[in-house]
Amino acid sequence: FPLLNLRMLHYPPERRVNTEDGRIGCGAHTDYGSITLLSDDGVGGLQVKPREGDWVDISIPEDHLVVNLADLLSIWTNNRYVSNPHRVMNPANTHRYSIPLFVTPPYHLKIETLPTCLAPGETPKHKPMISGEYLQSRFDGTHTYRNELMDDAL
């Protein structure tokens, strides 16, 4: 069974990091698993980076979801479907709320390019990996403060 992680996120208006476009609520990243379903409160702030060009504001119509493709789906499809970089630029003086549902393969599952996503003679662009090991490495890389806290605890 896939792992499902439902989060309820609050981006307060008083963020310290400013840019010309607004306030960073969540820096640029790709999601780790296979897909993410996202609902928000209509305030705005979600941006996606196309392969070429600048960040694009995404408006989610009421009663609709955004579907983000994530890293492990890219591996399965040999980059036919690529995880999309995105970020949140929280509008100034506004609270922002969103509810993402992260869908991830089971922790022990071997992730490798599907044969149907390879053209004749094509080789996979990614090495096979275990889902949970990949997720843990991405989590550790994103949340480096955890390692610092553990070092201080010892």
Residue ranges and their predicted role:
Residues 1-154:
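C-terminal flanking tails of non-heme Fe-dependent oxygenases
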